[in-house]
Amino acid sequence: MKKFTLLLLCFVLPMTSAYAARIKDVAQVAGVRSNQLVGYGLVSGLPGTGESTPFTEQSFAAMLQNFGIQLPAGTKPKIKNVAAVMVTAELPPFSKPGQQIDVTVSSIGSAKSLRGGTLLQTFLKGLDGQVYAVAQGNLVVSGFSAEGADGSKIVGNNPTVGIISSGAMVEREVPTPFGRGDFITFNLLESDFTTAQRMADAVNNFLGPQMASAVDATSVRVRAPRDISQRVAFLSAIENLEFDPADGAAKIIVNSRTGTIVVGKHVRLKPAAVTHGGMTVAIKENLSVSQPNGFSGGETVVVPNSDISVTEEQGKMFKFEPGLTLDDLVRAVNQVGAAPSDLMAILQALKQAGAIEGQLIII
């Protein structure tokens, strides 16, 4: 029987602040975020592992034309050391022109490997279509690919994706609303009304009354100085304040592929009884030979004989009393020896019966 893994998360928040969270660990400043960049380019210098797809040939011809080299009309360059790629990067907040960022390069054609290639100058654009960085450099590819003359092939990891550390130069700064207005808004990473109110209370206890207010379950607005230098010092002090976030909602997370189950601290069970059993149907096909009597004129034939047996396991039942916790659920499930599929069926049935106080999430 396939085993399942059961993980128990029991987070106990004491009354003291020994395990309190910093504001910077549970929230982020609104408008201060990274931005995704993307670009299309060519990788050259491949040892015969490139491609000759139409769009690669077109891009190659356009690149030569930019350097003043005009190919004769109708010419289709047969290239195997060039590959068309997409280049992606993440532009951190407050990045300044001249700073460098990492880029990821991935093949979009039929190239077999990017190992040993060099990315040619590629413009990286943001959502607004503006160029924010320019990428170029030698790729580092962890994967490999080898192919024999008889068609045998060995591939390790992914040879068509590589990275260039500090491979892009920032050319344009992304404007942020950090220095504008009279307020700074913090957005919680996990929305919760109680956490938002506790965070606002912690800021008010530090700065004074009416300095912070919870706007909703996600946002907390804090009055801040207008001077940008004072605002940086102000934010540095605020983000290091500690407070006790609220406990998370009662949840049971089930991974249907791995059989992993995570049960939250506040999951409670209502009165219920569950029967767990199984029925096995086995069908066996036996072939026998039918031999006719001598001089009867009949033919020898093969006759299939089906043997069907049904085996039913002894049903198992466990009962939940009011107010039982996840410990009781774990103990009961382990006693019946349920497989992952059986356990998920039990949890779904309990949820549909209204016997679980909490969310059941299957991923």
UniProtKB/Swiss-Prot annotation:
Q: Which UniProt keywords apply?
A: Bacterial flagellum, Periplasm, Signal
Residues folding into a coiled coil are none
Superkingdom of the source?
Bacteria
Query: Where does it reside?
Result: Periplasm; Bacterial flagellum basal body
Q: Which GO terms describe its molecular function?
A: structural molecule activity
Signal peptide range: 1-20
Cellular component terms per the entry's GO annotation: bacterial-type flagellum basal body, distal rod, P ring; outer membrane-bounded periplasmic space
Main location, first listed in the record? periplasm
InterPro entries (alphabetical): Flag_FlgI (IPR001782)
Q: Give the UniProt record's GO annotations in the biological process aspect.
A: bacterial-type flagellum-dependent cell motility
Its biological purpose is as follows: Assembles around the rod to form the L-ring and probably protects the motor/basal body from shearing forces during rotation.
Q: Which family does the record claim for this protein?
A: Belongs to the FlgI family.
How the protein assembles, per its UniProt entry? Answer: The basal body constitutes a major portion of the flagellar organelle and consists of four rings (L,P,S, and M) mounted on a central rod.
Query: What name is this protein filed under?
Result: Flagellar P-ring protein
Organism field: Vibrio vulnificus (strain YJ016)
Give the taxonomic lineage as stored in the record.
Answer: Bacteria, Pseudomonadati, Pseudomonadota, Gammaproteobacteria, Vibrionales
